[in-house]
Amino acid sequence: MQSKVLLAVALWLCVETRAASVGLPSVSLDLPRLSIQKDILTIKANTTLQITCRGQRDLDWLWPNNQSGSEQRVEVTECSDGLFCKTLTIPKVIGNDTGAYKCFYRETDLASVIYVYVQDYRSPFIASVSDQHGVVYITENKNKTVVIPCLGSISNLNVSLCARYPEKRFVPDGNRISWDSKKGFTIPSYMISYAGMVFCEAKINDESYQSIMYIVVVVGYRIYDVVLSPSHGIELSVGEKLVLNCTARTELNVGIDFNWEYPSSKHQHKKLVNRDLKTQSGSEMKKFLSTLTIDGVTRSDQGLYTCAASSGLMTKKNSTFVRVHEKPFVAFGSGMESLVEATVGERVRIPAKYLGYPPPEIKWYKNGIPLESNHTIKAGHVLTIMEVSERDTGNYTVILTNPISKEKQSHVVSLVVYVPPQIGEKSLISPVDSYQYGTTQTLTCTVYAIPPPHHIHWYWQLEEECANEPSQAVSVTNPYPCEEWRSVEDFQGGNKIEVNKNQFALIEGKNKTVSTLVIQAANVSALYKCEAVNKVGRGERVISFHVTRGPEITLQPDMQPTEQESVSLWCTADRSTFENLTWYKLGPQPLPIHVGELPTPVCKNLDTLWKLNATMFSNSTNDILIMELKNASLQDQGDYVCLAQDRKTKKRHCVVRQLTVLERVAPTITGNLENQTTSIGESIEVSCTASGNPPPQIMWFKDNETLVEDSGIVLKDGNRNLTIRRVRKEDEGLYTCQACSVLGCAKVEAFFIIEGAQEKTNLEIIILVGTAVIAMFFWLLLVIILRTVKRANGGELKTGYLSIVMDPDELPLDEHCERLPYDASKWEFPRDRLKLGKPLGRGAFGQVIEADAFGIDKTATCRTVAVKMLKEGATHSEHRALMSELKILIHIGHHLNVVNLLGACTKPGGPLMVIVEFCKFGNLSTYLRSKRNEFVPYKTKGARFRQGKDYVGAIPVDLKRRLDSITSSQSSASSGFVEEKSLSDVEEEEAPEDLYKDFLTLEHLICYSFQVAKGMEFLASRKCIHRDLAARNILLSEKNVVKICDFGLARDIYKDPDYVRKGDARLPLKWMAPETIFDRVYTIQSDVWSFGVLLWEIFSLGASPYPGVKIDEEFCRRLKEGTRMRAPDYTTPEMYQTMLDCWHGEPSQRPTFSELVEHLGNLLQANAQQDGKDYIVLPISETLSMEEDSGLSLPTSPVSCMEEEEVCDPKFHYDNTAGISQYLQNSKRKSRPVSVKTFEDIPLEEPEVKVIPDDNQTDSGMVLASEELKTLEDRTKLSPSFGGMVPSKSRESVASEGSNQTSGYQSGYHSDDTDTTVYSSEEAELLKLIEIGVQTGSTAQILQPDSGTTLSSPPV
């Protein structure tokens, strides 16, 4: 048994020894065990230290290497009681024996360590072997620390560091300065960089003990740069010698180590030499140089060579590429050009791109002649021509020669120099040319250009249109800063012109192009411009064509004067040609013959005559000397001369005008009128000729009453000729012709007798009817053409995606608005012409005020407007928001169905104000709710409604014409204060009336819907997204015109019940499309969804959408799943289908606004055609039925006749079904769903009274204002207007009756009055109606709301 144990031990020892011999880790070795189980052992000096270590394999000891002579005193012995056990013994230990004692397995890292303090109070510091040098190296880096190795034999010494010189003491601060008995004294290096030496000092029992002295040596580490020489472009051929120098520049006291990396690092012929370079005294840097030399390079030596210099704390590198060629060669590079084009005056560079080693010799030749460098040409690797000219055109040859192999390569480059058009006449110095009036003139334009000009164009402009203004910059090369030049082909208002074809001529040895312009008659002064263009530029010449004429005399008024009349003689002369105008009178007797200009001798002797008094006037071109003769007499007759002197030649020019004064003569009538007898239907023509001086005025009388022109009475030639066409019996009577002047009257008379009976021939009727038909045809044709042209022009407008809401892919709105322009000259309106009135509404930071604007348009002196402005204390961002809305309104432009901008007040000195149209009837939602008791769904032929008796409606006057007018309303690029399109253009015969006094019909609802669609179509065409389309944002103006408002200004959504809180934001969830609710995506298609909700509001007469539905996450989920609102109470099947199309879950499947305009226009047209035929009627005596499967509340007959998409109930018949079906086919609408999930009604419960919380927000997102609650209570006292159309209160939230009761201007038209209101639920309202019905003994039927019927009463 004992032998087996010994064998096992031997095998284990063998395995362990083998593992140790090959360096393998032992199998699960434990750490050596020390006899003293402590990390730190403290003993006193002169005692014996003995520690035993036991393990599982061979052990060794390590002890401190201090200056203690422990090598002779330490004894390590094997234990007697163990195989792997060693004992360390040190007798009479001293302080320098302090340190770490380590027992470890041989050839492994497994060890046990104990730190032993030998307390020796006479020598508390340990002197290690490394301290013999006594040197501490530091750097001046503030982030570096240095350790002074003054170790201690006592762990808790109070140690400080002393520095010399100057002397300074450092005490540990627990932060960056500390002392550790095992490590030493740690301190930032910069704190002792000044010192020459340092030492540690400790106090024990009031005695000081010092460590050895340490010399402080400050060393540097910064390397400024590493430079390789040569740095780049190193090329060699096989066998040549490579020498690379690497220079490192450092600060002083730095040691550098160089390290090279290159392809053949084991090259046998390489040699490295490192040395320090001498630096000048006083220099603050040091240089080190390392040279790499390779003798006889080979192809394998090609590659990247990197030199790295390191100071220990910093390393920098630099690299270069060495290319080794097999042999010398030369060749041209692939990018060498063969053709170079340049323009005169440019700097031309033709590089010689080559590949070769060594660099070749380069020679340049032009057309075979060697080129030498001079002040204009530099011939080298790059041929440079400083200012190229025409003579530099030619072939340039470059020849490359290898200096070793003498190989040659050549390449030819063709240089073509272009010349921009130069007009020869432009260099001539000539004054402004004057040309005689009425003469034929020829203007010439001679052009030299390479290549010849593509074309030469002539332009012109009137001289006065191009007058220099002080603000215009005028230069010598462009003395006429004209802008609006016109082609000579359009000489309207100018001289008649003929342009000859261009001709080519050899002039001064150059091929030039000559263009001539022939002015057939010089009538007006103008500027003519000749413009020539070729591929490199253009040239132009402006010719001043000043037309002058001699002095002219004109008479004002332009007729011979009569005695006692005033007359003026005007002498007009060109002010640039003539001066010193003077009037003379030759004598009372006229010249024997009439002459226009006096002979020169006579003109020279006029100084002997008396000068006449006259007044001088001047304009931009002429001087006018005016001589006035007041109350002319016969003595004023004679020849009058105007003298003018030529400014240049001082030659006199005299023109004469003979003045004749006529004698006054009383009126007389030549001939007499004769009595006439004429049959009915014929025509009468008579003449009455009168003479006299002054000429008399002729008037006609019938039976002593003034005869005026009528449809059958025509007066011509100054009333001298009277024509009566198709005479009637009443044309019979006494006709008088009377001629009167200041000298009296003369008259003649005649009696006209009319015979025959009063009748109209068939021919006349046919002619009248035919003429009317032809006129109407041409009128309709003209309207179609104009509308087509407008539509084509409108389509060409290109605008960015900026408006009320921007496309998310575009720039943010504020950035876009910063880029939008504001033209103050077009839109600025003076504040002093604006009279502010009562407030219309207030918002979070904005308010809207009614005001009177004086002179804001051309149609009226004063106009009522709405002024948007900020409240006091508005911030800069709020100011920018209002300015952004102003710029957006300018960008959108003018449209009939949009609240249009009229002006703005933006200048400093007052508040920022935006002036828009005023809509007196407020918003559409409030208006529809106010008209519920006056709603009549059908029309009769009655002219007016009879209030309190019959609810019948009349078709509005000329609906078709109004529809066409509204449909054709286009955007106008409004500039300045837009002149409001007069609504009289839309309805000329419809007088203004208060809309609140009229009854509301189904036609009105369709018309409102059509107009909103038309306005949104316009906004969509302007790339605008409204984002908040609702009835509260639709304003009602006069004559039933609706306008879209709310362009993003200061809506007080925190107090608006239509805005539901979602997170930290309030959103109008009831009007928002699913993609907007869930993905925050706003598009034109999301506006179409909102338009569908707006239709529901209109056809429910202002009810709030989703009545009785709690607006929460469940509502949003059901909406996304396809649940929709049931049909409103006053709709038709077609309109409800349109709503469902707008609510399609897929945005791309919803109709566009253009399709909606077409569809609603067809419905409106069909409604208009029912006059006298069929009428759009909703059931009166029958109740509204509910289809069980669809959930739709549609007015229909008791027997449903709906099949698929078609409604055949005659009550809903439309004449224009073809147009409707076409819309259904062309649009994206799908078939009518068999079943539509709808939100359920509110169940009947006990009335519940709730108090609105502070934020005015209920679960449904609606509140009921106090004033509207009173209105609701008053409404419960009224009987229903008619049975079939009474809204089912189980399907309409009572709170919606008064939601958002504002004046209509949503953008800031909000009230800040937020009194706490009481909310009455729909159940309470329904119970009130039932209670009233019971109390009044009404025959109303009380039906369950879930049975598909509604509460109804007999019609009034």
UniProtKB/Swiss-Prot annotation:
Post-translational modification: N-glycosylated. Ubiquitinated. Tyrosine phosphorylation of the receptor promotes its poly-ubiquitination, leading to its degradation via the proteasome or lysosomal proteases.
Topology Cytoplasmic: residue spans: 786-1356
Keyword Lipoprotein: no
Any one of the GO BP annotations: negative regulation of gene expression
EC number: 2.7.10.1
Active site: D1028 (proton acceptor)
Listed transmembrane segments: 765-785
Glycosylated position list: 46, 66, 96, 143, 158, 245, 318, 374, 395, 511, 523, 580, 613, 619, 631, 675, 704, 721
Annotated tissue distribution: Detected in cornea (at protein level). Widely expressed.
Record keywords, A-Z: Angiogenesis, ATP-binding, Cell junction, Cell membrane, Cytoplasm, Cytoplasmic vesicle, Developmental protein, Differentiation, Disulfide bond, Endoplasmic reticulum, Endosome, Glycoprotein, Host-virus interaction, Immunoglobulin domain, Kinase, Membrane, Nucleotide-binding, Nucleus, Phosphoprotein, Receptor, Repeat, Secreted, Signal, Transferase, Transmembrane, Transmembrane helix, Tyrosine-protein kinase, Ubl conjugation
Effect on the protein upon substituting Y801F: Abolishes stimulation of nitric oxide synthesis
Noted disease: Hemangioma, capillary infantile: A condition characterized by dull red, firm, dome-shaped hemangiomas, sharply demarcated from surrounding skin, usually presenting at birth or occurring within the first two or three months of life. They result from highly proliferative, localized growth of capillary endothelium and generally undergo regression and involution without scarring. Plays a major role in tumor angiogenesis. In case of HIV-1 infection, the interaction with extracellular viral Tat protein seems to enhance angiogenesis in Kaposi's sarcoma lesions.
Written domain comment of the UniProt record: The second and third Ig-like C2-type (immunoglobulin-like) domains are sufficient for VEGFC binding.
Family membership: Belongs to the protein kinase superfamily. Tyr protein kinase family. CSF-1/PDGF receptor subfamily.
Known function: Tyrosine-protein kinase that acts as a cell-surface receptor for VEGFA, VEGFC and VEGFD. Plays an essential role in the regulation of angiogenesis, vascular development, vascular permeability, and embryonic hematopoiesis. Promotes proliferation, survival, migration and differentiation of endothelial cells. Promotes reorganization of the actin cytoskeleton. Isoforms lacking a transmembrane domain, such as isoform 2 and isoform 3, may function as decoy receptors for VEGFA, VEGFC and/or VEGFD.
Protein's name in the database: Vascular endothelial growth factor receptor 2
Lineage, highest ranks first: Eukaryota, Metazoa, Chordata, Craniata, Vertebrata
Gene: KDR
